[in-house]
Regions:
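Membrane-embedded beta-strands that build the outer-membrane beta-barrel scaffold
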Residues: 2-6, 11-19, 55-63, 70-78, ...
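Conserved small-residue
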Residues: 64-160, 191, 196-248
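Membrane-spanning beta-strands of outer-membrane beta-barrel proteins
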Residues: 50-52, 163, 274, 331
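Outer-membrane beta-barrel proteins
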Residues: 22-28, 68-69, 81-87, 188-194, ...
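Outer membrane beta-barrel strand-and-loop segments of large Gram-negative receptors
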Residues: 18-65, 96-104, 108-110, 139, ...
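Extracellular/periplasm-exposed beta-strand and loop segments of Gram-negative cell-envelope proteins
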Residues: 26-32, 41-50, 87, 100, ...
């Protein structure tokens, strides 16, 4: 690590690098011969090994310019890990093993957009997740065997947990006025969106489709003309065609094999965000006024919490880390107050 102090301690910083190997991690055995007879109830053992490396740091800068005093401070943590051993059976496809990848690595199919027409379907590898139609999601045949199935599931995107976490604080005073802001953020993470709020007509829902799903779905010209709505045959539309069939929801659970509702890059979203976590603005009355009313100190203040968030993901709060969007969001609040010291 490095510790530094510059400009008569106006600027201070600390940076630490870490490289940790952790072995003997207690976990369920993943690979046991069938002759052992424990396929349905595998024992736990100290068989896992993970290597983690990264850095964390913080800094602070203080300065005074005329009557203005201000402080800037920040912190950052970045980490990346790799699974070295987890007692897993050798897979036909090395890319489907957990070893060599990160903990919480997202996995799924690679989406190539939506099928444009039936010629596109006939000229593409056969997809084994139910019959497909134009407007359904088209996937990449990773292993080149002519079919798309679970053998084409690969590591995609980043991890479901942030690898990067940071914060920034700003504070300043000028005579009786004081302002303080605190930003926080996270990056290097992605998550899948799913559930009835995203997948229309699933989980027993027959209506209440989100407007964004309805307006941005794929819809062919013939259907659009019948319904009197604009057509959208864009192979990169935000949502596939609406469906009641087994390719959509059918009469089975959402966890069974269906083409459009598979974990894939089509439903993978960026979990990065920056949030103005708190802002505090206050004014302390001058001593000559306070003394007249026989108080020691009087401060009027306003505090705001979770007022602004910047993120490419707009459907719900990315900090929740929720794929379904059904958790109660963080509340925004503004508080006005008066602090009096006698």
């Amino acid at each position: 690590g490095i510790d530094m102090a510059l400009f008569n301690d106006k600027f201070t910083a600390t940076i630490d690098y870490f490289d940790e190997s952790r072995s003997g991690i207690y976990m369920e055995r993943a690979f046991l011969p069938g002759m052992v007879g424990l396929d349905g109830n595998k024992p736990y053992a100290n068989v896992g090994e993970v290597n983690s490396k990264g850095f964390d740091g913080n800094f602070s800068y203080k300065q005074k310019i005329s009557d203005v005093k201000f402080t800037v401070r920040g912190n950052i943590t970045y980490s990346k890990n790799e699974i070295i051993e987890r007692d897993e059976e050798n897979n036909v496809y090395a890319y489907q093993m957990k070893k060599g990848y990160r903990v919480n690595q997202n996995r799924g199919l690679i989406a190539l957009g939506l099928f444009k027409d039936y010629d596109d379907i006939r000229n593409s590898p056969t997809q084994k997740y139910g019959p497909v139609m134009p407007g359904d999601i088209k996937y990449k045949d990773v292993n080149g065997d002519g079919v798309v199935n679970d053998g084409d599931i690969v590591a995609i995107g980043s991890t479901s947990k942030p690898n990067l976490i940071y914060g920034l604080g700003l504070s300043a005073t000028w005579k009786g006025l004081d302002v303080s802001l605190h930003f926080q953020g996270a990056g290097k993470s992605q998550f899948f969106t799913y559930g009835k709020c995203i997948w229309a007509f699933t989980e027993g829902q027959w209506g209440n489709i989100l407007k964004g799903t309805l307006d941005n779905r794929w819809v062919d010209a013939e259907t659009a003309q019948k319904l009197g709505i604009p057509a959208n045959e864009n192979p990169n539309a935000s949502y596939p065609r609406l469906s009641y069939t087994d390719n959509g929801n059918g009469n089975t659970t959402i966890y069974e094999y269906k083409n459009n509702y598979r974990n894939s890059t089509y439903w993978l979203r960026n979990g990065s965000y920056v949030r103005l976590k708190t802002i505090d603005v206050g004014y302390t009355l001058p001593k000559k006024i306070v003394n007249k009313i026989h108080f020691n100190n009087v401060r009027i203040f306003m505090t705001g919490t979770n007022l602004l968030t910047w993120s490419s993901f707009k459907l719900w709060d990315p900090e929740m880390g929720a794929s379904r969007g059904e958790q109660y969001p963080l509340a925004k609040s503004i508080t006005l107050g008066l602090s009096v010291n006698l």
